[in-house]
Amino acid sequence: MFSFCSGLWRRNWAIFGLHFGIMIYLYSVGADDMGITELAVLRWLHIIAMVYWLGGEWGVFNTSTHVINRKLSMEERRRHMQTAYHIDILARIGIISLLPLGLHMGHLWGVQPYGGNFLVAVWVLAAAWLTLCISAYFYRETDTGIQLTLWDERVRFVLIPVMVIASISSLLGHGPFNVGPMQYWFSIKILLYSVTLMIGLKLRFIMREWTTLFRVLAEGPNQEAENQLEKSLALGKKLAYFYWVTIASVAFFGATKAI
């Protein structure tokens, strides 16, 4: 009975989320921008990426509670950890996809002046980053997976300062993005997106630590490993609240373009 109710609850929320997403999409497109256009398709993909990003992070947040539950068997805890990884990969794909989609749409809106070869390079590099991220997911419980995850993190170490500098420089009027009446929103959105990458990077550290700690726990009970697991998850949950607020802010500026 509980399983049925739980499934019904998840289905109702999924239906609500779908209706809400369609409503936001129609509101943001407007009556004068209907039809299958390049911008409309990119916006549709952007909405899907945003939904999986935010929804995926919520799923990981709830599933992770069972990972540190000492009352559960190691097998069950490991199963919950695997579920968290399965959900998280969708969020990772979403957050990476938002970058090329946003830069491409920004060019069509006239707030990001670089098109042509620049956009081609952005899409190629984003595809390479996605390949790296997905490969790390498939090899997540091996040494190869850990190394791939480290390379994924190195990409973020390079990308984050580049985006922070570019967005702040643009807000100060020095480019590379255009600013003016009703154009500041794009640079603000890029800055907030870079903040989410910072938080996400720390959450990546936490999930990578899970793999290491579960290797220790697989050898037998270990109080120190259990304590560290609980400590890291407690920090992750605190970060998650700020993460959601920042994600919502990114969506707000993207939808309203109010500044």
Roles of regions detected by a PLM:
Residues 2-5, 13-41:
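Short, strongly hydrophobic alpha-helical membrane anchors
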Residues 5-8, 15-16, 21, 138, ...:
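Extended hydrophobic/Leu-rich segments
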Residues 8, 12-15, 106-111:
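Membrane-protein biogenesis/insertion across secretory and organellar systems
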Residues 26-259:
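Polytopic transmembrane helical bundles with strong interfacial aromatic enrichment
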